[in-house]
Swiss-Prot record:
Pfam families: AcMNPV_Ac75. This is Uncharacterized 14.9 kDa protein. InterPro entries: AcMNPV_Ac75. It comes from the Viruses. It comes from Orgyia pseudotsugata multicapsid polyhedrosis virus (OpMNPV).
Amino acid sequence: MAGGLRGFVAELKKSTEFVAKVIFVKARLSDWLNSQVYPDERFSAKWRGVLKMFVDGQLDEESVYCLVNTIDPSKLLTVGQINYLARAFRNNRKMMSITQKFVDGYRLSDDDISELSNYLVAQVEEVYQL
């Protein structure tokens, strides 16, 4: 009985940590979009252009790596991990649809940001297992 409960508690803790990460990513992403991207039409157009090149497969692995390191200079992800994340993202229809929506000039909905945040947290956790 105690072993089953321990497993339950461990699973609950893991789930709670995942949800907390998703909430954190969603809050940061929403804040960034609403405070920096959407209000600044010039920056927004540049960012949409970069994402359009990503969606269209025009960015090589080195360009994606440089882009990630510009956004997050901590360099916690290796080249292989970034390549894995980029391929996984490109192969996910829902994520590409959300990205295309943004590229086309639409504001992302709260549901879009939630799905994007959930996906990103899951993928980053997976890539750290590699």
